[in-house]
């Protein structure tokens, strides 16, 4: 069903057998029973808006749009493009959405590893803004992820991954960021979901 509003989508999603559709690249690999498929594609949530202080990314934005966005590329010194360019292929990244990638909290997710290193928040329809590092620890519920917000904190960041083949899932992924608040390191593909390490004692 194509939702006419977020309110309608939220109400429909309260059924246990309902499912919010993203790019459907991972959903089709599962075997869950879905009686109500909720399509958010008509709600204008597929854009990236850049302001002086942040990037606001709609949940339906394809990964390919993040990869090609010049503002994100410049801000992360190419790290976000590096984190995305190995994900399967261009056609796949044209379908897969950033919202689906973050909501899934997948252990193999390059996207989650990258965004955890930045000052990132998610906007939930009912839950409001939540820090991404807190969101990944939350149990999955029937809320809807609406947007991802990346604050433009001055930083230096680098992303690296090890793969057995070019377009395979990463064996290990790592994103390290340096800012005036210190060093933040994120390790992904462990195979558990990405792990954030804050250098609270200034050892790094």
Describe these PLM feature segments.
Residues 1-204:
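C-terminal structural segment of proteins
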